[in-house]
Amino acid sequence: MDIKRTILIVALAIVTYVGVLKWNQDYGQAAMPTQNVAASTTAPGIPDTAAGTNGSASADVPSASATANTAAAPLETPAVASKDLIHVKTDVLDLAIDPVGGDVVQLRLPLYPRRQDRPDVPFQLFDNGGERTFLAQSGLTGTNGPDARAAGRPVYTSTQKTYQLADGQDTMVVDLKFSENGVNYIKRFTFKRGLYDLVMTYVVDNQSAQPWAGNLFAQLKRDASSDPSSTTATGTATYLGAALWTAAEPYKKVSMKDIDKGQIKETVQGGWVAWLQHYFVTAWIPDHNATNAVQTRKDSQGNYIIGFTSPTLSVAPGAQGETSATLYAGPKSQAVLKELSPGLELTVDYGFLWFIAQPIFWLLQHIHAILGNWGWSIIVLTMLIKGLFFPLSAASYKSMARMRAVAPKLALLKEQHGDDRQKMSQAMMELYKKEKINPLGGCLPILVQMPVFLSLYWVLLESVEMRQAPWILWITDLSIKDPFFILPIIMGATMFIQQRLNPTPPDPMQAKVMKMMPIIFTFFFLWFPAGLVLYWVVNNTLSIAQQAYITRKIEAATKKAAA
């Protein structure tokens, strides 16, 4: 039975490590006068191809339901960004808007430094033409949409080139204007203090003699560059790719490989489209009451696009109409994302053990609210988990202590039966039955802790709250590996001590394998997040104390009975 236990431990170690690696592979300005509104909407069709227009920009513009007034254009025309960007800064966002099309082409997060040693350099989420391509685009396409013009995307004007949320100001509105053929357009961005979501609204003021019709589109465009927010240590890559909401699947991942295979089209009511990376998410959220056409595609420049097209907005002559969507660009904060749209909080992906990980994060968050330090919070969480499993662990350690106590009898059986494994195995089972020992009892703590261990791994890896979270001394970031490998070495030492408390396998080969386990696990844990290794160190330390106490108690009782 000892060989089964050895095989189980080795198998769990290998499965854990390989499972982590496999997961990683699947993932690496002034307002217009208010007028009477006379507008209606109809559902959009899902386009079969991307449509653009001649001129500067329109390979980026998706086609809506084709009409005689919709200008088809070459697909190969790349977007050309304006050098004269409009800069907007709030307390949590620092972004730039391109007047050509009104796209958000740059975005930084001032509260999230790119590196811990450079707190003055904010993490850059969007970039266009720098190190990579990642931006949020939106516009009006369809019959009369200005983004479907043969002349290219509209060039907006603004009253200022720089906007900043002032002290004491809670809301800031940035209006971009464009007029053509008697129709006045306002592309309005509304920012609020402390929020990473902004509302983008199109106001269509139709002063022409003809009805106006168009569709709002919003999309995220990204190249295939690596994730700048992800750690690079072995075993810590996370999912980089798109995702969307459907009624049947509230969180549907769409990887770059999926987009390479062909367009994905869905018709959904409400929903959202998003691009995920480590710790951060960007999402377009349309009107939750509207039926929207969601689509993914790959443009001729090799960029990946996921977006939606809203129902047709119709505006009568002399009337005004509005259509809007919300853009979120910021950290994966579950509470915030859940309020924005159903299912969006699932972008904090805890894997197949999410039902264990979610309560762990909830408890960890509440402990942190009291202690104010994630490292100490992990220690307290470990103590609570250990207390929860105390009865089960105690039963297991009692079984192991009894096996340790009968070790001399097992050695005697080995001498009696020699190399006759069948008789040896039969004699061992009779001895275990006589002594009321469960030979597999020592495996229970490992089996029970593995789901908790894996769940905590994803909590530490996926939760933005852990990003750059310090503990003490040299541990300045619990979400990445220990820079000096001190915690993994301590963990290996605790495993060695635990091993000394366990019964020695009667087979010499098994004994050698067991002696190698602390070294093997130490190697595995070298690149694991420091917070996870901290959990394992504390758990092992508590286990040693519990097991040593039970072992001494049973050995004393055994000696007393023998006297």
UniProtKB/Swiss-Prot annotation:
Entry keyword annotation includes Magnesium: no
Subcellular location: Cell inner membrane
Cleaved signal peptide residues: none
One GO-annotated biological process of the protein: protein insertion into membrane
CDD domains cross-referenced by the UniProt entry: 5TM_YidC_Alb3 (cd20070), EcYidC-like_peri (cd19961)
Keywords: Cell inner membrane, Cell membrane, Chaperone, Membrane, Protein transport, Transmembrane, Transmembrane helix, Transport
Gene3D superfamilies: 2.70.98.90
GO molecular function: membrane insertase activity
GO CC term, one of those recorded: plasma membrane
Membrane topology of the entry: Multi-pass membrane protein
Pfam families in the record: 60KD_IMP (PF02096), YidC_periplas (PF14849)
Region (Disordered): 43-62
Transmembrane intervals: 1-21, 344-364, 370-390, 440-460, 471-491, 518-538
Keyword Calcium: no
Function noted in UniProt: Required for the insertion and/or proper folding and/or complex formation of integral membrane proteins into the membrane. Involved in integration of membrane proteins that insert both dependently and independently of the Sec translocase complex, as well as at least some lipoproteins. Aids folding of multispanning membrane proteins.
Family: Belongs to the OXA1/ALB3/YidC family. Type 1 subfamily.
Subunit annotation: Interacts with the Sec translocase complex via SecD. Specifically interacts with transmembrane segments of nascent integral membrane proteins during membrane integration.
Protein's recorded name: Membrane protein insertase YidC
